[in-house]
């Protein structure tokens, strides 16, 4: 029954390690009943199970789904633009 505050924990972590951190946080909330308050730009961490996301770029601050956040849409549009290159593999 603890609360942890993390400020951009994805800094210096590879995408693979961000996914490991995501799993660790989800397991911690499930098995140890703790809560996390996280400031992040990582689409991996924004996809945390049952996360309540506050978009601090909006005035007033609103809650959004992770797929509605502008930085996630930038990633999506970037990879969508090069989708054919992934299909060639």
PLM regions: where:
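Walker B catalytic acidic pair
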Residues: 7-9
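Walker B motif beta-strand of ABC-family P-loop ATPases
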Residues: 3-5
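ABC ATPase nucleotide-binding domain "signature" loop
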Residues: 11-14
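C-terminal lobe/lid and adjacent interdomain/linker elements of RecA-like ASCE P-loop ATPase modules
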Residues: 16-37, 42-89
């Amino acid at each position: 029954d603890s609360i942890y505050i993390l400020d951009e924990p994805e800094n210096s972590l590879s995408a693979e390690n961000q996914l490991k951190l995501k799993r660790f946080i989800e397991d911690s909330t499930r098995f140890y009943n703790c809560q996390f308050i996280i400031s992040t730009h990582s689409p991996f961490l924004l996809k945390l199970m049952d996360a309540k996301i506050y978009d601090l770029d909006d005035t007033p601050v609103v809650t959004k789904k992770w797929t509605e956040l502008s930085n996630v849409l930038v990633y999506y549009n970037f990879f969508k633009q090069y989708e054919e290159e992934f299909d060639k593999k």
